[in-house]
Amino acid sequence: MTQLEWRTIFANNLLCILREKGMSQSQLARDSGLSVSRISEYINMISTPTIFAIINIAYALDMDVNELVDFDSRIV
């Protein structure tokens, strides 16, 4: 899997989860300790999240990291 493919799948998962939870990017940024611009970069596939960011996002979404990066479970 290429880095671009990984970013695409992660972004799609994140968007789907945000919709499921009725959560905005701003709320996720606040709850995860990341900036709104950083969350936007992940969703728009501009940058690849660090493991630190993935852990913080998963915690903010009240889910296991594995659920967040499960590349077979969600389709937007």
Summary of predicted features, one role per range:
Residues 18, 29, 58:
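The alpha-helix within a helix-turn-helix
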Residues 52-67:
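DNA major-groove recognition helix of helix-turn-helix/homeodomain DNA-binding modules
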Residues 1-23:
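A short, Lys/Arg-rich alpha-helix, primarily the initiator
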Residues 19, 33, 44, 73:
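Residue-level detection of the helix-turn-helix DNA-binding "recognition helix"
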Residues 11-12, 37, 51-54:
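Short alpha-helical elements of helix-turn-helix
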Residues 22-41:
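Short alpha-helical DNA-recognition segment
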Residues 43, 61, 69-72:
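DNA major-groove recognition helix of helix-turn-helix
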